């Protein structure tokens, strides 16, 4: 393992820190990052970033945080720049108090499109389909639960937020970086993509089947819709079955992140047969 020597930066207008500029400017960040790179923050998420195989562009850390990042750079053979600065410089660059003082930029992996999506899904047996999720924290929470509970890929419609937004990556604790992600553009496209899958649509409707009572199929795609409206009827029609999580009286529904975690745990439980 090679020793990595940090590069001190003492001014916020240093052009080498451009990837980290104004992180709270959402439109500006979309324009800057595009489909090229993303930001990961926090020690745990960054450890998961290194383990994910994404190419690291650079890291920016408070001076006292450098030793752990040096270990990660050496462990994974990373040759990207490791910049250090004080808290005032980091605040001026990023636009907010990054209290954990650890942030990195990494290149995105290409998103599979068209028939390439079938190749990605070929060896999998449990995936989730998300429609209309526009809250990065919900998506991040779902990705974290998915990877923890045996869900192997995310299939998103075009209205879902970018799963690589900084807040999604942070809330997922970096787990979203370990899940293949792809898009579908219409119910017909989704139906074609999932032609070899059993598809369940999760809904709070009382006439839907109790998910606890069902045998989990060999290949299952579990669909969830956005907070409030849920799945569109045309998307729901792709499903072979509509399922619900039974709730106590007077509770009509769960937050989509909580519902996803519960459903993932149910469908991934060991068989008792």
Model-derived features with residue positions:
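Amphipathic alpha-helical repeat scaffolds
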Residues: 42, 134-142, 254-258
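Glycine/small-residue-rich loop that forms an oxyanion/phosphate-binding "nest" at active or ligand-binding sites
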Residues: 74-103
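Short, aromatic/basic amphipathic alpha-helical patches
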Residues: 67-79, 234-235
């Amino acid at each position: 393992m090679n020793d990595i020597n940090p590069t001190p930066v003492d001014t916020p207008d240093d052009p080498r820190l451009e990837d980290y500029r104004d992180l709270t400017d959402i439109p500006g960040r979309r324009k800057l990052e595009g489909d090229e790179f993303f930001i990961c923050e926090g020690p745990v998420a960054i450890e998961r970033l290194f383990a994910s195989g994404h190419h690291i562009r650079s890291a920016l850390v408070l001076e006292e945080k450098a030793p752990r990042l040096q270990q990660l750079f050496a462990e994974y053979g990373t040759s990207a720049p490791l910049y250090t600065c004080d808290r005032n410089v980091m605040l001026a660059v990023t636009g907010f108090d990054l209290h954990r003082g650890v942030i990195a930029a990494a290149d995105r992996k290409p998103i599979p499109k068209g028939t390439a999506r079938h190749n990605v899904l070929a060896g999998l047996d449990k995936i989730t389909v998300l429609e209309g999720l526009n809250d990065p924290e919900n998506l991040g929470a779902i990705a974290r639960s998915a990877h923890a509970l045996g869900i192997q890929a995310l299939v998103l419609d075009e209205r879902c937020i970018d799963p690589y937004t900084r807040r999604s990556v942070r809330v997922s604790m970096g787990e979203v970086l370990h899940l293949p992600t792809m898009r579908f553009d219409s119910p017909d496209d989704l139906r074609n993509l999932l032609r070899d899958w059993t598809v369940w649509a999760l809904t709070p409707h009382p006439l839907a089947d109790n998910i606890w009572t069902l045998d989990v199929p060999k290949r299952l795609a579990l669909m969830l819709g956005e907070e409030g409206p849920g799945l569109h009827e045309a998307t729901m029609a792709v499903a072979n079955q509509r399922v619900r999580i039974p709730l106590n009286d007077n509770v009509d529904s769960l937050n989509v992140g909580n519902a996803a975690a519960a459903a993932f745990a149910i469908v991934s439980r060991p068989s008792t047969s």
